[in-house]
């Protein structure tokens, strides 16, 4: 029997040794558990050596306990292998090392299960043989009683076997449920490292316990107490594994709640960003959505260690914008789950980085199946987590800096866009009021035209009546009547044309006004819808917060339940320790019984056996109660697992709903963008239409006959200047020729002197005196030449300034007259004392009334041509040197203001026409006109030509005026009254653009570059500073904080003032001082404080933009 037991026990020993070796290879940390297992084996071996026989009761109880132990362990050994096999199809990318480790684990599991089955079958056969031998050895006297006891024991054994089978089925169900729950928890959580370590720990414990049980059973056959001790030792292990699972579930619930909190925070951030973009980006369609996001790729580092994943994804991501907030939910959540599985340093980095991913591109993270399938890789990441965390912190710092720059640029551009939108709204309101006023004037004009047409019809009937009377009385009427009737016909035709044009323009303006009102209503409706959408999103956010609060309450309840279970397990552990002590006592008693039995006192043995049976029954009842408590504990664990599954389902549904809402919001945002683009194009079209209509209205009111005089005057001036230039050139040529002749004479004279130097010393002295005289005359001639050149330049500059002043004053007078015309404030066309006739609606009506009633005056009014001098802008500073710029800006700064010059303007009505023409023709014209667009200058010249024709016509009319030709003068007087206003000398497009550029110099720049004024000025600065080193202008705050941008911009115009190659970005104060001094040297006043610019990293972008606008206005307009 000993040989058989040894041979049978050798198989579990080998398997146990191989299992412990593989366990040590997989996880060296579990050596402590193996050592404790060895300690447990020694007392069992000693007990087996001291005991050779046992009673049938102890053998029956031991057999039942062994069956339970083997069944439970067999099922538990299959459970850990089933969970990875269920999760294995979900893995997509696993390295070869992980595959090898999982393969070895599965092979060891299979060998363990087969070894356990074989050992259990051999133990059953050995127990049967021992029972038969012991029944034969019993004495024949007590055989009857023993047979009765055997029958009872067999019945009790069958009952215990039924109980064991039931407990087996229950334990099998519980183990299968636990395996399913473990698979679910693994699928939900990405904490692969923790789960893997715990699974390996449990496997090593199972192997150690199986090795201990095999050794104890093989070396002590029939040792019921040692096997019962093994059962009692196994039950706390099962409870401890259950508690470990509960703790894991609790941590998983905490992590899920943290994820929900982070997701709620992300949703709030996205709502704020979305509301901000909807409210403040109505006029900027090409803006903050232009930042492109590079697609991050999974680098090899994310398979070798977890820290590399964070580093590679930070390096692979690009700067984002507010659009990326609405499209990267899933990746952000996966990244958050993956970062929670790192150690403390990496988890801190991930907590720092997580809110960054909610406002920019979401980082690419490995999937849950990949992170589950790599336990060995997760273990290897500890070594590289420190380096990866340092790299991650550096990358995060750089990323935070980039995102701050993008955020400040975006806010700056949004504020500039809002300001421009407010300006455009104000301009639109002004244009609407202007259109309304023009419409009212047109209504008045139409009424007056209707009245005049009625009067015309009445007068025509009277004329017919008077003609019929004259024909009846045979009285011949004069030819002047025919002339007068022709004049009335011409007036009638003019009235009809004006009425038709006014009606057509009124219809056009009404259509434009209706279109603008409809567009405004649509914009208000879209704004209202956007506000409603924002309110709905806020309500949804509140609902999500309430859900999270309820989840937190559930989590607190689960934590309390877990504490209760811990307390229960602690009490059970205390009870088990007490039972172990009792078991030791019982072992001692059994040893005493064996000794007494050997001595031969059987009566005492019977009493002791009865007491032992009673103690055994008590111990069995206590064990059954403990098993019931264990069953209750497992049921509670199942309920907790169900609650966790429900929470997970709710979380998945909530996540899907959030994704759908985000997609809907993205679609709504795209629609709003497209609508905004369409409205922007419609708005620009409307502006162009308004400008064109305004031009047409002004052109219909202006008379186009003022161009020839200005052109002829300019041609005469150019001819005179050319003649003067030729005269000066002839004088210079004569002086040069005289100089050459004198120098030739001097050389000849010197040659003669050299030949006769010995003979004529006295002639030499005379010649030297003549040489001195000639040099003095030459110097005087040169000085005279220089004086003449300077006088010529002064005359030219004076004439240019005078001519520019006349043109500038003329433009101002034109605008004043236009304002007077619009306000309806003017004097009558027929007034002989008026020197500045401005035809308005009322004056036209009065002129039409007086044309048919009052005789014409003796002299017609001479139209005014304001040509008084005014200050003119200097040429661009880039075209002259700094010294010349100072000399030019001197007299201009001391010039009189425009109003004073316009008040001192002479009254050309009091000057004779011949003197006026002589003064105009003799006045010099500049060689180059001021810097205005070519089209505007051409229009000004054409208008001036028409004004000259009007003046000539007025002169001829004044000279040829007589009482006999008053009717002819009356015929042309409406044309004169309409054409005599200086308003006609400038086209409305030119006037509106000049007015707009004087008010806002960035409007032309915005038309040139497109987009908003801020972006246009930014592009202009980038174009000007292109090619300069260390210059990157992306905004008007941080890009200008070192002063190099100012220096580069001013260096393009003033290279003599700024030594750009010597500048350094560290010396900010010197850069700002150089730039501001250079700007002040040409008259640009500094509006920025040097100390504030040096101190702050982000100066006020509005102040910087105003200063750059002043630079652009000075040098480019």
Swiss-Prot record:
Subcellular location: Cytoplasm, Cytoskeleton; Cytoplasm, Cytoskeleton, Spindle; Cell junction, Gap junction
Comp. bias intervals (Low complexity): 45-90, 358-377, 971-990
Gene Ontology biological process: actin cytoskeleton organization; adherens junction organization; anterior neural tube closure; cell adhesion; cell division; cell migration; negative regulation of actin filament depolymerization; negative regulation of microtubule depolymerization
GO cellular component: actin cytoskeleton; cytoplasm; filamentous actin; gap junction; microtubule organizing center; spindle
Biased composition (Polar residues): 93-117, 293-303
Effect of residue 415 to P: In OBLFC1; severely impairs the stabilization of microtubules
SUPFAM superfamilies in the cross-refs: Calponin-homology domain, CH-domain
Family as reported in the entry's similarity comment: Belongs to the cytospin-A family.
Protein name as catalogued: Cytospin-A
């Amino acid at each position: 029997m000993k040989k058989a037991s040894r041979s049978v026990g050798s198989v579990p020993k080998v398997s146990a040794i191989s299992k412990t070796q593989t366990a040590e290879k997989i996880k060296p940390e579990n050596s402590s558990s193996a050592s404790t297992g060895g300690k447990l084996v020694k007392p069992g071996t000693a007990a087996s050596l001291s005991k050779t026989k046992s009673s049938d009761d102890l053998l029956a109880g031991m057999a039942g306990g062994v069956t339970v132990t083997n069944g439970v362990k067999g099922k538990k050994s299959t459970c850990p292998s089933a969970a990875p096999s269920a999760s294995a199809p979900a893995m997509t990318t696993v390295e070869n090392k992980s595959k090898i480790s999982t393969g070895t684990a599965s092979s060891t599991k299979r060998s363990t299960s087969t070894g356990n089955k074989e050992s259990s079958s051999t133990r059953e056969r050995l127990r049967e043989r021992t029972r038969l031998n012991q029944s034969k050895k019993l004495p024949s006297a007590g055989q009857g009683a023993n047979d009765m006891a055997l029958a009872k024991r067999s019945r009790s054994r069958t009952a215990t076997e039924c109980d064991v089978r039931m407990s087996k089925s229950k334990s099998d169900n519980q183990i299968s449920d636990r395996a399913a729950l473990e698979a679910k928890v693994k699928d939900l959580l990405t904490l692969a490292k923790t789960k893997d370590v715990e699974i390996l720990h449990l496997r090593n414990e199972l192997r150690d316990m199986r090795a201990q049980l095999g050794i104890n059973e093989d070396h002590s056959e029939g040792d019921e107490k040692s096997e019962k001790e093994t059962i009692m030792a196994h039950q706390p292990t099962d409870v401890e594994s259950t508690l470990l699972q509960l703790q894991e579930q609790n941590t998983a619930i905490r992590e899920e709640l943290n994820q929900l909190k982070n997701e709620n925070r992300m949703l709030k951030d996205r709502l704020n960003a979305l509301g901000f973009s909807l409210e403040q980006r109505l006029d900027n369609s090409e803006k903050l959505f232009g930042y492109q996001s590079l697609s991050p790729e999974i680098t090899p580092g994310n398979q070798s260690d977890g820290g590399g994943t964070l580093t590679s994804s930070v390096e692979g991501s690009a700067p984002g914008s507010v659009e990326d907030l609405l499209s990267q939910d899933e990746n952000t959540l996966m990244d958050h789950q993956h970062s929670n599985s790192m150690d403390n340093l990496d988890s801190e980095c991930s907590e720092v980085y997580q809110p960054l991913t909610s406002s920019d591109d979401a980082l690419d993270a490995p999937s849950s199946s990949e992170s589950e399938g790599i336990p060995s890789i997760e273990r290897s990441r500890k070594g590289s987590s420190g380096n990866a965390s340092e790299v991650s912190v550096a990358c995060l710092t750089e990323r935070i800096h980039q995102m701050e720059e993008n955020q400040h640029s975006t806010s700056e551009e949004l504020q500039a866009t809002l300001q421009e939108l407010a300006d455009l709204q104000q301009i639109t309101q002004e244009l609407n009021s202007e259109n309304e006023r023009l419409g009212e004037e047109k209504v008045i004009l139409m009424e007056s035209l209707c009245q005049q047409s009625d009067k015309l019809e009445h007068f025509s009937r009277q004329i017919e009546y008077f003609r019929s009377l004259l024909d009846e009385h045979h009285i011949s009427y004069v030819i002047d009547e025919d002339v007068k009737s022709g004049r009335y016909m011409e007036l009638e035709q003019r009235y009809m044309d004006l009425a038709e044009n006014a009606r057509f323009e009124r219809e056009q303006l009404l259509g434009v006004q209706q279109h603008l009102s409809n567009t405004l209503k649509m914009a208000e409706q879209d704004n209202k819808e956007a506000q409603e959408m924002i309110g709905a999103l806020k309500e949804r956010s509140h609902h999500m917060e309430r859900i999270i609060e309820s989840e937190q309450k559930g989590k607190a309840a689960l934590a309390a339940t877990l504490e209760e279970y811990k307390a229960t397990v602690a009490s059970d552990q205390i009870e088990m320790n007490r039972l172990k002590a009792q078991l030791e006592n019982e072992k001692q008693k059994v040893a005493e019984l064996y000794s007494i039995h050997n001595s031969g006192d059987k009566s005492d043995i019977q009493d002791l056996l009865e007491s032992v049976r009673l103690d055994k029954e008590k111990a069995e009842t206590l064990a059954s109660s403990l098993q019931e408590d264990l069953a209750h504990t497992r049921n509670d664990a199942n309920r907790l697992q169900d609650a966790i599954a429900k929470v997970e389902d709710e979380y998945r549904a909530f996540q899907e709903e959030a994704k759908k809402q985000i997609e809907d919001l993205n679609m709504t945002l795209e629609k709003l963008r497209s609508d905004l683009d369409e409205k922007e194009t419609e708005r620009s079209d409307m502006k162009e239409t308004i400008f064109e209509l305004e031009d047409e209205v002004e052109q219909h009111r202006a008379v186009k006959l003022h161009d020839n005089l200005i052109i002829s005057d300019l041609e005469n001036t150019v001819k005179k200047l050319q003649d003067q230039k030729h005269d000066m050139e002839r004088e210079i040529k004569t002086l040069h020729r005289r100089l050459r002749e004198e120098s030739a004479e001097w050389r000849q004279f010197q040659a003669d002197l050299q030949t006769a130097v010995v003979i004529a010393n006295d002639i030499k002295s005379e010649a030297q005196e003549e040489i001195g005289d000639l040099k003095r005359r030459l110097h005087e001639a040169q000085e005279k030449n220089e004086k003449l050149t300077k006088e010529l330049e002064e005359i030219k500059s004076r004439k240019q300034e005078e001519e520019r002043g006349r043109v500038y004053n003329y433009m101002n007078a034109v605008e004043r007259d236009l304002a007077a015309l619009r306000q309806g404030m003017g004097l009558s066309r027929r007034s002989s004392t008026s020197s500045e006739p401005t035809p308005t609606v009322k004056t036209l009506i009065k002129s039409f009334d007086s044309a048919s009633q009052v005789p014409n005056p003796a002299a017609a009014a001479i139209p005014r041509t304001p040509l008084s001098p005014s200050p003119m802008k200097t040429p661009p500073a880039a075209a002259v040197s700094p010294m010349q710029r100072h000399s030019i800006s001197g007299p201009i700064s001391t010039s009189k203001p425009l109003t004073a010059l316009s008040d001192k303007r002479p009254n050309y009505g009091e000057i004779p026409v011949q003197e006026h023409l002589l003064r105009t023709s003799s006045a010099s014209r500049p060689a180059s006109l001021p810097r205005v667009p070519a089209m505007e200058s051409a229009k000004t010249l054409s208008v001036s030509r028409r004004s000259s024709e009007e003046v000539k016509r007025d002169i001829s009319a004044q000279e040829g005026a007589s009482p006999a030709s008053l009717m002819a003068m009356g015929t042309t007087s409406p044309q004169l009254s309409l054409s005599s206003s200086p308003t006609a000398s400038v086209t409305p497009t030119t006037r509106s653009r000049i007015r707009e550029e004087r008010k806002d110099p960035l409007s032309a720049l915005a038309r040139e570059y497109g987009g908003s004024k801020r972006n246009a000025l930014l592009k202009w600065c980038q174009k000007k500073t292109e090619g300069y080193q260390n210059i990157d202008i992306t905004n008007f705050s941080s890009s200008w904080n070192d002063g190099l941008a100012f220096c580069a911009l001013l260096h393009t115009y003033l290279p003599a003032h700024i030594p750009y190659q010597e500048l350094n970005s560290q010396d900010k104060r010197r850069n700002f001082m150089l730039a501001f001094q250079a700007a002040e040297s040409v008259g640009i006043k500094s509006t920025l404080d040097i100390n504030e610019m040096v101190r702050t990293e982000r100066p006020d972008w509005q102040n910087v933009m105003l200063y750059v606008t002043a630079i652009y206005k000075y040098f480019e307009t």
